[in-house]
């Protein structure tokens, strides 16, 4: 609560070095809004500078999460493109795609600006993974507002998406708005949105068949089947890849995997040299 407070880069880099020495392979940078990191200390946001410093520590993966769209700058995108160990993964909570609802939510962005951000990222990093979250059933959301959201999702074909129904909280600005929707309508809209994204997810996954990905092994199903993640997926919230291997793999290993099968959300493959 209260204003954003940033730790200075030096202290964060020192902590990161200790984590690296302790054997950490994936470093995750997260805050209420990582895109404004350093604004209170340096007079302007400096997430790009922090990421550049972290990239020198030689983690296998560095992932930054929860950056508001208005804070994603060309400088940040360029740093991600520059370093192989910074995951080309952008977690951008867009919340909605109707300008009217975005305004009611007090968001500092618009549908066109959201599209421009996605286009900027993809023009610089064509294979970037873009993750977002949307809220359906916000007070005052009309049928046409929801259709705008559906249209945006179908147009942009975002790689990863989480969605939630609006949940009323007392004494919040949204609670005082008119036009609260019944739970049945909110649930119907959520189900439709998720079905649209499910089709998109499977379509994007099928394009990965035959490609090779660096995979972090995280669990074992049986003697020859493991569960892992590519850099396209954050832990717990995204998809997994099932890895078939005749050789024994250890949890925490990085291996190269050829994608053989694609499902609605997950993938399946085998070791490159299996």
Name these PLM-found stretches.
Residues 176-274:
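Terminal RNA-binding accessory module
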Residues 38-55, 105, 168-199:
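Radical SAM enzyme [4Fe-4S]-AdoMet core and its adjacent flexible, acidic
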Residues 20-146, 154:
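Conserved SAM/AdoMet-binding glycine-rich loop
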Residues 12, 29, 64, 92, ...:
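Conserved, mostly hydrophobic/aromatic
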């Amino acid at each position: 609560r209260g204003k954003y407070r940033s730790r200075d880069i030096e202290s964060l880099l020192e902590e990161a070095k200790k984590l690296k020495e302790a054997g950490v392979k994936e470093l995750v940078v997260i805050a209420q809004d990582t895109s404004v990191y350093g604004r209170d200390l340096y007079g302007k946001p400096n997430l790009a500078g922090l990421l550049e410093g972290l990239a020198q520590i030689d983690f296998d993966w560095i992932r930054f999460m929860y950056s508001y769209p208005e804070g994603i700058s060309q400088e940040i995108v360029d740093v991600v493109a520059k370093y192989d160990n910074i995951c080309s993964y952008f977690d951008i909570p867009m919340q909605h795609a109707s300008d009217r609802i975005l305004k009611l939510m007090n968001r500092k962005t618009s549908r066109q600006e959201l599209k421009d951000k996605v286009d900027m990222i993809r023009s610089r990093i064509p294979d970037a993974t873009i993750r977002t979250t949307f809220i359906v059933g916000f007070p005052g959301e009309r049928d046409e507002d929801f259709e705008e959201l559906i249209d945006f999702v179908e147009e942009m074909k975002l790689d990863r998406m989480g969605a939630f129904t609006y949940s009323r909280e007392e004494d919040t600005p949204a609670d005082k708005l008119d036009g609260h929707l019944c739970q049945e309508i909110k649930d119907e809209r959520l189900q439709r949105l998720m079905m649209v994204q499910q089709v998109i997810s499977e379509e994007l996954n099928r394009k990965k068949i035959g490609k090779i990905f660096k995979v972090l092994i995280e669990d074992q199903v049986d003697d020859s089947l493991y569960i892992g993640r590519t850099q396209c997926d954050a832990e717990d919230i995204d998809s997994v890849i099932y890895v078939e291997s005749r050789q024994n793999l250890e949890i925490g290993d990085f291996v190269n995997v050829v994608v053989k099968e694609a499902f609605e959300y997950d993938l399946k493959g085998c070791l490159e040299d299996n």
